[in-house]
Amino acid sequence: MIVSKISGIEAIAFDIDGTLYPAWKLILHTIPFFILHIRFMNAFRKVRHILHRRSSSDPDTALPDFFNVQNELLATQLNISPQEAGNFLDKEIYKGWKKKFLRIRPYPFAKEAIIRLKGAGFKIGILSDFPPEQKGSVWGILPLCDVALNSEALGALKPSRIPFLKLAEALNTSCVRILYVGNSKTYDIAGAAAVGMKTAYIANPLVSFFRKKPPYADISFSNYRQFLNYVL
């Protein structure tokens, strides 16, 4: 039997980028890449915004081939072929950034907290808008997971309901018994809440200190020791 300060939860799932590691660390390590490929990265940012917006406006419809659509949108932005856009994206970002993540460290105590949660009986999951394996073992967290999903492969980025429902299905746990942890109010928290999951928002320390239960999430925390204390 799981004993938790948050009643009714049986599984805890995490976003990765900005949630398990500070987003600024990736920015720091990719500055040279951004400068060298600024046109492509600006186009990619616009395309992801379009795809996120689509997921928000039509949260129950998946794209039949997400990657083809993404490549076509990129091709339009850059005036190149979809194949060229897709090849660059796959080689330089999806695969090419793997080595950058080797130099990035996770938030302190993140892995240790997840080990404790796993030991307490919780199912552990990951749901990310990028492939979890892009981060290798996700700093040793991936082997602890019962489920690790990439929303792109499911045809819809967050905050679409689809990836969150697929997460619940893969965990074999009803949405109301899942706590989802993320750093984006718009994508992580809104998407998880829309299917009935409980939500935890990793926030700026001052925000977390002054407002432990913000209106947009069930709990807010600024470090993983604090998060563990809220749950166990």
Regions from the language model: what does each represent?
Residues 1-53:
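Active-site neighborhood of HAD-like aspartate-dependent phosphohydrolases
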